[in-house]
Amino acid sequence: MQLEPAHLVYAAFWTFGLVNNVLYVVILTAAVDLVGPQTPKAVVLLADVLPSFLIKLAAPFFIHKIPYNRRITLLVGLSTVGMMSVSLASPLFLKLVGVVLASFSSGLGEVTFLQLTHFYDTRALNGWSSGTGGAGLVGSGLFMLLTTVLGVSVKTSLLVFAFFPLAFLGVYFYLLPPRDYNRVPGAFPVHSNDPETGIETQPITWEFVASGYETTMVRLKPLVMPYMLPLFLVYFSEYTINQGVAPTLLFPMEELPFSKFRDVYVTYGTLYQLGVFISRSSAPFVRIRRIMIPSVLQFANLVFCIAQSMSPILPNVWLVFILIFYEGLLGGAAYVNTFLLITEQADLAEREFALGSVGMSDSAGIVLAGLVSLWLEPGLCNYQVNDGRGWCTLE
């Protein structure tokens, strides 16, 4: 039985989203294992997101000059080598180098695949969004299954994920249907001397980048308020919760369904990703057009979680589990609805540029969250220790 091209498009972009984000999720889920309870988990967050943010920040100025097939090959190399380093290296520095390589791959992948959706109908974007949500569930869930349930070592568990990026090659070159290059007039002129992209090939020089700076900034300006600001706020809020507050949302061991405190953190990550997966997959059924609403609700969630850490309001971990799941629902809903609105509202000539550029705002929010969490997590932990609740210092 042969699948229809529309189904192949959805399956291909679902796989792209899954594989591109799964390593990012696993690294954050394993943060407590990589750096231990005494080091702020935001160290891993910054190494995991800052390179990705820099790629997204620079991409609008040059990324259209690199053919898609070369980008895919680069993604596989960076992510595979990165995860090998994370899983096999002993010094923390080398582990963080591996995290940085995987982060570069993740950022390049997000820009690449979001731009690639421009050549297909909305099934591509729906598949990508659902796949990125699935990455969270697969990454955190499989890591929790291997380490917490089955007792597999962290090293071996991380090594398993090093082989995931190979799927990019098979899906892009053999599963994804050919795309339509009948493009509308846009900022990137259509020429025929590059058969893979239809874009004129020329060297990427400093003069080329500088000459396009002002034009690019003008094109970014109308994207800020309706799309980039809400996405920035929701990501800042949820990643501050995940890396700066969640490690301190603990209860006495006898009240927990675990034997180690690190299992609480891993479970929080899995529940968050479950919420993200559900909401990112909900776009065909539920649409949110006022995307500032989930962003503001997420910020309120952050304030509540900080209050919970300082003076417990919720009496047990089960209610905190629900709170973290709700956090994931808000974040996933904001993400998928933002990019769907772009496909509906942006001019066709600007759509590919907008899809590839708005993603820098979520990374900016995560970077700021990491910087805040470097101070926030130790501050909350010290407050709890002085209050007689020193569980955040234990494994």
UniProtKB/Swiss-Prot annotation:
The gene is BTN1. This is Protein BTN1. The keyword Protein biosynthesis does not apply. Residues 1-31 form the signal peptide. Its main location: membrane. Involved in vacuolar transport and vacuole pH homeostasis. Also required for cytokinesis. The lineage of its organism: Eukaryota, Fungi, Dikarya, Ascomycota, Saccharomycotina. PROSITE patterns: MFS. Belongs to the battenin family. The keyword Transport applies.
